[in-house]
Regions:
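ABC family nucleotide-binding domain
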Residues: 1-151
Length: 151
């Protein structure tokens, strides 16, 4: 279960403090699908960054399976992110010098996964890109880049 309790996120700038999230409360149960929708500038990306352990709230509690994520250090949050979350960024965040296979293999290196090349190749096959395994991002269409991110 994922819980947010009275979560605020404030970005401090020289000109002003921007209150991106105010008193957010949210419960997401295991197996539940959730869609985050709102106007531009409403805090969707900020919320997703917190939920994905990429950022911490300014105040409030973020709990995953009753453990407070804010109490974790960067390495612990990275490990949690690698185990529990999958991301498809708006810009896909592919590294320009890596092939499709290397892109998918990269997070597996940090998780010490054995047979990571084979697992990465299987993931690319599942999204229909086995024939593009050695292609770099500039050789892939936008849709193909997105599928590499999904893999």
């Amino acid at each position: 279960m994922i819980q947010l309790k009275n979560v605020d996120k404030i970005y401090e700038t020289e000109a002003e403090n921007v209150h991106a999230l105010k008193s957010i409360n949210l419960n997401i149960n295991q197996g539940e699908f959730v869609s985050i929708m709102g106007q531009s500038g409403s805090g969707k990306t900020t919320l997703m960054n917190i939920l994905g352990c990429l950022d911490n709230p300014t105040s409030g509690d973020y709990l995953i399976q009753n453990s407070n994520v804010s109490d974790l250090n960067d390495d612990q949050r990275s490990a949690l992110r690698g185990l529990l979350f999958g991301f498809v960024f708006q810009s896909y965040n592919l590294l320009p010098r890596l092939t499709a296979l290397e892109q998918v293999e990269l997070p597996l290196i940090y998780q010490n996964v054995e047979d990571r090349k084979l697992k990465a190749a299987k993931a690319l096959d599942m999204v229909g890109l086995i024939d593009r395994i050695d292609f770099k991002p500039n050789q892939l269409s936008g849709g193909q880049q997105q599928r590499v991110s999904i893999a």
